[in-house]
């Protein structure tokens, strides 16, 4: 469960290291975002000499959350951190690599490019 002011790790090589959620895209007054939701975030920590700089406002899709994810078949998945992948306006990832495992639900939400870059899909 990601809400505004939540800090997230970045799971790609776009140049950002840490994000802070500002807004959840989709509804005007949604309180929490879950895996697969698009958020507006600000970069709190960035790698030097990369295209993305600190205090830049970007869009990101959530790929891992500490809160459990319950699937229809009864399986429960929980990750060790909250993480997101930086995307552009069309939904394509800004980086060329994705680090760590991501959830299978992203494929159903048409983030197939992120799923294909991921080393492990749970």
From Swiss-Prot:
Keywords: Chloroplast, Plastid, Ribonucleoprotein, Ribosomal protein, RNA-binding, rRNA-binding. Its main location: plastid. It is found in: Plastid, Chloroplast. GO terms for biological process: translation. Gene3D superfamilies: Ribosomal protein L14. CDD domains: Ribosomal_uL14 (cd00337). It comes from the Eukaryota. The keyword RNA-binding applies. GO terms for molecular function: large ribosomal subunit rRNA binding; structural constituent of ribosome. GO terms for cellular component: chloroplast; cytosolic large ribosomal subunit. InterPro entries: Ribosomal_uL14, Ribosomal_uL14_bac-type, Ribosomal_uL14_CS, Ribosomal_uL14_sf. Binds to 23S rRNA. Part of the 50S ribosomal subunit. Belongs to the universal ribosomal protein uL14 family. This is Large ribosomal subunit protein uL14c. It comes from Nandina domestica (Heavenly bamboo).
């Amino acid at each position: 469960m990601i809400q505004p002011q939540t800090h997230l790790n970045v799971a790609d090589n776009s140049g950002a290291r840490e994000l802070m959620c500002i807004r959840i895209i989709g509804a005007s007054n949604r309180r929490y975002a879950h895996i697969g939701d698009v958020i507006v975030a600000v970069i709190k920590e960035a790698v030097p000499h990369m295209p993305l700089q600190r205090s830049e406002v970007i869009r990101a899709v959530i790929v891992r959350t500490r809160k459990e994810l319950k699937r229809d078949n009864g399986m429960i998945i929980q990750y060790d951190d909250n993480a997101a992948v930086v995307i552009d306006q069309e939904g394509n990832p800004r980086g060329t690599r994705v680090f760590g495992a991501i959830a299978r639900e992203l494929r159903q939400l048409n983030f197939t490019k992120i799923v294909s870059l991921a080393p492990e899909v749970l």
